Amino acid sequence: MAKDIKFSEDARRAMLRGVDQLANAVKVTLGPKGRNVVLEKKFGSPLITNDGVTIAKEIELEDPFENMGAKLVSEVASKTNDVAGDGTTTATVLAQAMIQEGLKNVTAGANPVGVRRGIEKAVATAIEELKAISKPIESKESIAQVAAISSGDEEVGKLIAEAMERVGNDGVITIEESKGFATELDVVEGMQFDRGYTSPYMVTDSDKMEAVLEKPYILITDKKINNIQEILPVLEQVVQQGRPMLIIAEDVEGEAQATLVLNKLRGTFNVVAVKAPGFGDRRKAMLEDIAILTGGQVITEDLGLELKTATVDQLGTANKVVVTKDDTTIVEGAGDSTQISARVNQIRAQMEETTSEFDREKLQERLAKLAGGVAVVKVGAATETELKERKLRIEDALNSTRAAVEEGIVAGGGTALVSIYNKVAALEAEGDVETGINIVLRSLEEPVRQIAHNAGLEGSVIVERLKHEAVGVGFNAANGEWVNMIDAGIVDPTKVTRSALQNASSVAALLLTTEAVVADQPDENGPAAVPDMGMGGMGGMM
């Protein structure tokens, strides 16, 4: 395949055209008066969204050089989304501003390497200043404000604040599509796993089709139970105590299942069997989690333990267990709190070490079940199109809130970036390094300009006034008033603002130092013709 090569000014200009096309499509969504973008989908209805990264990922340009520029900025949005979960539009706006200003200066004769050093120096100072003015998030109201600003909906803010309060920082909050119109919160207290009873005859409440066990013993094993004789000794001990029993095993089948169901129906004892959650090594780890949570032991041959010699002392206990056809929930397990804490720390250490996103997600789920809880936000809407858009906004709000809890908050609406302007401007440098610093200074103003522009106002006027206002005072584009941003609840997570600035400067510096761009030449003949597959001598067949 032959290649097209462009050098210096031609190369950078071609990439800038791509940067501008992508950034211009994304930046219309910024701020409280930002608009939506409609994305065509090959199947189903179009997607309407104001999520920067979703828009950026959809954009493919015909010209390969322009497309490379667009993809570089798309990477800024993706990386910011991966790290902070929000702020993708801000990152795109910052990247475009730095690239545009940088190319003007490089075209005018500035050395790109010196400019790059200036950009890096200015951004390092800006990030230090952002950390210095960051305020920790302390109340449920603050969490609600962050989520409301990100999603543009106060009700969503309250919902996410309540979810985070109920499950804690280690809890898992998932977002699902609801069948109805309302958006609601469903919180699962205790440990829940997705395995239900092995037989519907085990239910205690036939209206709700669930089995509720009060203060049960819990037998945990990784073995299949086929023969009732294996568990008879421990069953007899539990019956003597007069308490119900939950059996968690790889499977309970055949004669063992039949005997348990028969005795349950006769009222001899109350027992429910469920399959162990997970598979392979993950199953072993989850069974150990359940054992630690309930103060029991996993009956496994790995530890030299057998079912027929198991005693009541090796069983776990809990205040209550609820089993449905799909799920088992263990509420208030009787495990030792120091052992649970040690297990939580062990899982945290594994999360830090793993390189797999899937493994990290599964470890986070295990951590939540041990330490926090699980909350499900069920998103409702009138149409499928609205549902998708609403779900994306709530996901952004959730990520934004987590970032705020992690690193604190700064004044929102682009105010924080302008408030650190003077500290960055005070940096001493000369020549091309100074040019790099000035490029960053210009870009720090850009989010405020764009928010004002989207609200139908002149950005430059707002920026100039903002520079002379007291620290923390900013422009509320939603109603056109000048207010103390943090007091008014207009806040951004520090992590989101920091990540946007870091990722934008990284890609801008790389693009400015580009001297040649190589792309595949378009194939002018189009795709090769498909050979005729007709079979000779069979022309008469229709």
Swiss-Prot record:
Its main location: cytoplasm. Its EC number is 5.6.1.7. It is found in: Cytoplasm. GO terms for cellular component: cytoplasm. ATP binds at T29, L30, G31, P32, D86, G87, T88, T89, T90, G413, N476, A477, A478, D492. It catalyses: ATP + H2O + a folded polypeptide = ADP + phosphate + an unfolded polypeptide. Keywords: ATP-binding, Chaperone, Cytoplasm, Isomerase, Nucleotide-binding. InterPro entries: Chaperonin_Cpn60_CS (IPR018370), Cpn60/GroEL (IPR001844), Cpn60/GroEL/TCP-1 (IPR002423), GroEL-like_apical_dom_sf (IPR027409), GROEL-like_equatorial_sf (IPR027413), TCP-1-like_intermed_sf (IPR027410). GO terms for molecular function: ATP binding; ATP-dependent protein folding chaperone; isomerase activity; unfolded protein binding. HAMAP family: CH60. Belongs to the chaperonin (HSP60) family. Forms a cylinder of 14 subunits composed of two heptameric rings stacked back-to-back. Interacts with the co-chaperonin GroES. This is Chaperonin GroEL. It comes from Listeria welshimeri serovar 6b (strain ATCC 35897 / DSM 20650 / CCUG 15529 / CIP 8149 / NCTC 11857 / SLCC 5334 / V8). The gene is groEL.
